[in-house]
Regions:
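Acidic, surface-exposed loops and disordered segments
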Residues: 1-112
């Protein structure tokens, strides 16, 4: 969300470096690596009392092109997402999304 990022005191663009990506079938692991890094940043921000939101960029070609142009990124860096960080207007109570029926043990037990 470009409007949100423009108003925030901080935005972090998480990029995959294709010069360091694995070869062959493992090449797309950069998405998982960057996603794990993103989640760690979100958790750290929350732990510091900051608000944060993960805004997706990749695999949208239009979004990737816009971020690449704005930041003058070289071709080997692919922007996965932008993390917008700021100060929340109020404390939000976490939602309890736990549902026992969403858990399966040893095999999938849900609707086929």
């Amino acid at each position: 969300n470009a409007g949100m990022a423009a108003k925030a005191p901080l935005a972090i663009v998480v990029c995959g470096d294709m010069n360091k990506a694995l070869e062959g079938d493992a090449r797309e692991f950069w998405v998982q690596d960057c996603s794990a890094a993103t989640e760690n940043i979100l958790l750290a921000a929350t732990g510091m009392g900051l608000g944060s939101v993960w805004t997706g960029t990749y695999p949208s070609k239009e979004r990737c092109a816009a971020v690449t142009k704005l930041l003058k990124l070289p071709k080997f860096l692919i922007p996965l997402n932008t993390i917008v960080i700021g100060y929340p207007d109020s404390q939000v109570t976490p939602k309890d999304k736990w549902k026992q029926e969403n858990v399966s043990y040893n095999a999938y037990e849900g609707e086929q």
